[in-house]
A protein has these predicted regions:
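Exported/extracytosolic protein signature
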Residues: 5-8, 12-206
């Protein structure tokens, strides 16, 4: 799976000889990426450092990997090929959004905080992940009812809430979110990410 440079340019592109920084070498983006004008002194070494991002064809599932192949060529030497395998980051990747309804809020009315949790990672956020949602409600709610994915949660067991301060926290590991699903577009070859989701709702009186 080819690498592409972020915004079509290296974030960092460093060239060292025996540990001493050198002027940037000539680079052809490609693919393949080609770096020319490298000098390796007798008994010494040269190091090239650059960053790149993977393209949309790279597999994202837990078993996915990218094999990066580099070939060293030059006058009077036999080409040398080296490989490095980069595996996927196998962990949950969570993000959360919060919304309030109804808007506008009426005094002494009922208010609902809704938290949408999305997991774009290839690994589920299970109980062992010990994920928590902690928030200080403003406005503060009283007589709250809490549910996750439509299932009622119990105060003290599944969450804690302080009506004096508005501090709300779910019990570590009570919120679980499935892994994302990955499908490959048959026309383009790009991988499409469908996040795993969970919805926490907290309803109470202002």
């Amino acid at each position: 799976y080819p690498l592409r440079r972020q915004r079509q340019m290296c974030i960092r592109d460093r060239y060292y000889i025996n540990g001493v920084l050198q002027p940037a070498p000539a680079v052809t983006i490609g693919p393949p990426l080609v770096i020319n004008g490298i000098t390796v002194p007798a008994g010494g070494n040269a190091v090239i450092v650059y960053e790149a991002e993977v393209n949309p064809y790279a597999p994202l599932a837990a078993t996915g990997n990218i094999v990066n192949i580099a070939t060293i060529t030059g006058g009077g030497i036999t080409p040398i090929e080296v490989t490095e395998t980069v595996v996927t980051d196998n962990e949950p990747l969570l993000n959360i959004t919060k919304s309030i309804s109804p808007v506008p809020v009426t005094e002494n009315g009922t208010l609902t905080y809704t938290f949408l949790i999305q997991n774009t990672g290839n690994t589920a956020a299970d109980a062992a992940t010990a994920a928590e949602i902690i928030d200080t409600f403003d406005p503060i709610l009283s007589n709250i009812a809490v549910s996750y994915n439509g299932t009622a949660l119990a105060a003290g067991t599944d969450y804690t809430y302080n009506e004096a301060t508005g501090l709300f926290a779910t019990t570590a590991g009570r919120i679980t979110v499935p892994a994302a699903a990955y499908t490959q577009d048959p026309a383009t070859g790009n991988w499409i990410v469908t996040p795993g989701t969970g919805t926490l709702t907290v309803t109470g009186t202002i």
